[in-house]
Amino acid sequence: MDNPERQLQQRELSDVLQGALLELNNEQREVVIMKEYEGLKFREIAEVLNISENTVKSRMYYGLDGLRKILERKKITKETIGYGF
């Protein structure tokens, strides 16, 4: 069971990530959410969105790169949140 401090840390991280996701363009955000939060495979995402698997991979790459840059801009790192992600 998580202690209250860990629960607060997880909520804060969730809030930060949700805010960062909103800064991505819709296409990148959609793919990142489907892959990372819903656990779909690239092939499944491609079928759902009716796009090629390579397009899904490209959007995922640029989406994750965008998230990294957004978090860096906000000075949020693995060390500042106490996790490895």
Q: Which residues are covered by each model-predicted region?
A:
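Short helix-coil-helix linker/hinge
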Residues: 11, 21-28
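Short, conserved catalytic or interaction motifs in soluble domains
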Residues: 26, 36-37
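C-terminal edge and immediately downstream basic/flexible tail or linker adjoining helix-turn-helix-like DNA-binding
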Residues: 16, 47-50, 65-85
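Residues within the DNA-recognition helix of helix-turn-helix
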Residues: 59-64
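Helix-turn-helix DNA-binding motif, specifically the short coil turn and the N-cap/start of the second
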Residues: 25, 41, 50-55
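Acidic, proline/glycine-rich intrinsically disordered inter-domain spacer in sigma factors
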Residues: 1-19
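A short pre-motif secondary-structure segment
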Residues: 31-35
